[in-house]
A protein has these predicted regions:
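Formylglycine-dependent sulfatase
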Residues: 18-175
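Bacterial Sec-dependent N-terminal signal peptides
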Residues: 1-22
Length: 175
């Protein structure tokens, strides 16, 4: 009987420990530049097939009442990733090439601003960022220095898939 009681006590402690484990949800935030509301299958598009995004939407939560806090991409990203109105920390326009007269500290999302990835890391999440960053191209602004554990994408903003020509000058802003 003594052995049975000891085993039951140990098992009850293990069961209690299992019950106390917090289940953290996984989540994916999809931000696409210039995407119209009806451009995805689950929002009604019949022209653009998006079966994988539709499946995610089917099994997840969709936020349809969001507010885009800027009309251009980099400030919108800054607002989303910090949870703040980006104008409050001086991020009100798209980034361009850093000119010599500008302080490089201001050529990206201010390092003093915490990101959603920073906050999620504090809660034990592993964070990844895939795609267009456009929140600074210098090392201090890299996604992997802003709370993301992994990054696969490109740091800059707009680009062309093929080499382009502007006023007779050829340029190639590759990925």
């Amino acid at each position: 009987i003594r052995r049975v009681l000891i085993i039951l006590m140990l098992l009850s402690g293990w069961v209690k420990a299992q019950q106390n484990e917090e289940i953290k949800p996984n989540f994916i935030i999809i931000l696409a530049d210039d995407l119209g509301y009806g451009d995805l299958g689950f929002t009604g598009s019949t022209q653009i097939k998006t079966p994988h995004i539709d499946a995610l939407a089917d099994s997840g939560v969709i936020f349809t009442e969001a507010y885009v806090s800027a009309p251009v991409c980099a400030p919108s990203r800054a607002g989303l990733i910090t949870g703040k109105n980006q104008v409050n920390f001086g991020y009100d326009n798209n980034l361009t090439t850093v000119l010599p007269q500008f302080n490089p500290e201001y050529s990206g999302l201010p390092v003093s601003e915490k990101t959603i990835a920073n906050r999620l890391s504090e809660l034990g999440y592993i964070n990844g960022m895939i795609g267009k960053w456009h929140l600074g191209e210098k090392e201090q602004f890299y996604p992997t220095n802003r709370g993301f554990d992994e990054f696969w994408g490109y740091l800059g903003g707009g680009h062309n898939y093929f080499p382009s020509e502007y006023n007779g000058a050829k340029y190639d802003l590759s990925l």
